């Protein structure tokens, strides 16, 4: 299979995986290690055609079990006047032409999953600014992997996955970056997939894409 196909398929592995990570109630506790799940999933989808990729991803989501939905709760939040104008665009989950009907249906249903129990990978903390307390995401559930100074292909892409999705869902200024954040993901999948590339150099380069000075 071509490198272009592998990068394209890996992109959907990352965007679908990120959506599942922050929306599926299965990640309210430590029953599942999503990093392990993703690294195991990657070779199954990396060289597959779109239809097979979509089927594998849909079955992967099913593997996390049943859950309750609370559509009214989240619709009320999304229609509130206090909702940030530049919130994450998740319209792509309804793209049946790209994702196929079954995968799209699973992602759309996850949007309304009851997440009352929270998420093990991100919590909300507060910091004081201008005499008021403002919410801030805290990613204290993420594993640091201090011993992986030169990780293999799977964990290199996991780095891209984790950072890109953190920014996608929790960094309100991503729309101000010089480069469209949607373009950053495929670029760094390609960069990290290159065996001759420096892992630390590419990681620093990716972080610098935030232009957060």
Residue ranges and their predicted role:
Residues 1-213:
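Flexible, low-complexity junctional segments that flank or bridge functional domains
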